[in-house]
Amino acid sequence: MASRMGMVAIMSLFVYAIVVPTSVNANAWQTDDKPGVNRNMEMQQQQGGFIGHRPRLASFNRASNQEGDRKRTVPSGPNHKHNNIPSHTPHHPPSYVQALYEDDRTITSPGPSKSIGPPPLPDRY
């Protein structure tokens, strides 16, 4: 009888521990007139705070304040300081990749006489 009363007490505490925090959390996410808005978020919006990443705004004032409001000169052509590839060479894969495709007839699979595997162990006996 005592064990049954103990089990009832434990089960009632267990149910209470599950139900009460769930209802408190449900009420915390609702305000008086705006359901689904957290009070902390609402307070931050009223105080002028922001949430998340704030993007940087571009400023074009410095470029226009240069000498006489003229455009900057931009060099044309490849930048030899940072680019070591000559501008007259075409960009293609290295020659060893082309050799694999040109020389397909010389590639043969190993025959039964050539075994693929680890090298034989030296005799240590």
Curated annotation (Swiss-Prot):
Q: Which UniProt keywords apply?
A: Developmental protein, Differentiation, Glycoprotein, Hydroxylation, Secreted, Signal
Transmembrane region positions? none
Outline the segment boundaries, as ranges, of region: Disordered: 45-125
User: Which GO biological process annotations does it have?
Assistant: cell-cell signaling involved in cell fate commitment
Q: Which domain of life is it from?
A: Eukaryota
Q: Which residues carry this modification: Hydroxyproline?
A: P75, P78
The glycosylation sites annotated in the UniProt record are: P78
Query: Would the keyword Signal turn up in this protein's UniProt record?
Result: yes
Q: Which GO terms describe its cellular component?
A: apoplast
Whether Secreted counts among this entry's keywords is yes
Signal peptide, first to last residue: 1-26
GO function term, MF aspect, one: receptor serine/threonine kinase binding
Q: Which family does it belong to?
A: Belongs to the CLV3/ESR signal peptide family.
Q: This protein is called what?
A: CLAVATA3/ESR (CLE)-related protein ESR3
Native species of this protein?
Zea mays
Classification lineage: Eukaryota, Viridiplantae, Streptophyta, Embryophyta, Tracheophyta
